[in-house]
Amino acid sequence: MRALAIACVAAALLERATVATAGQSAPGPDEFAARLAALALLQSLNAELLSHDSATATLERWCANHRLAEPAQIVAERLREEKPASAEVRAALEVRPDDPLGYRRVRLKCGDHVLSEADHWYVPGRLRPEMNLTLETSDTPFGKAIAELHFRRRTLSARLLWSPLPDGWEMSATPPETEAGALAIPPYVLEHRAVLSLPGGEPISEVVETYTGEVLAFPSPVAR
């Protein structure tokens, strides 16, 4: 209910404000209504991510609900990079220092919008062979590739990388000062770290997801 209320507030505010994403300019001015709308939307997305097991499915719904692309489909753009797992990651996955781990870094896109970048460390021995093959040879999002395992997600941390309004703004008698020009949104706005586990509790992957300013790059409502 809280997420729904926040989304309704954001929709109403967006009738009055347009925001620019990732430092790009837009017609909307940097004003209190635009910043409040951006904050409400980020909190709404954060709540959705925290309350569902699949970030891919959550982003796909976000893409559809906010008309980011047609069709509203999330695709993974795989980046051929390597990043060794830290001792902390191995501890979270309950594996020994010499146990093999898979690694995958992807950008999740909806149409032309890159909505997030994700680092996945996973335990190949706890996945089905066909799932490992899919992860190694295709751009299928991780959550879709292992969906048949009915995995569960446990969030380790979630933090805003950008706050449109300063701390304590709600206690002020006057709105915070804003800058001249369009409201600029930085490249990265939200970060989640989570462990994905089998229904029995055995961990299969740790993921660090960094969400971009493009999550707010949807068209403003048309006044009627």
For each feature predicted by the language model, list its residue ranges.
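N-terminal domain-onset segments
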Residues: 17-109, 113-175, 180-190, 197-206, ...
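Bacterial N-terminal signal peptides
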Residues: 7-16
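Positively charged n-region of N-terminal signal peptides that target proteins for export
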Residues: 1-4
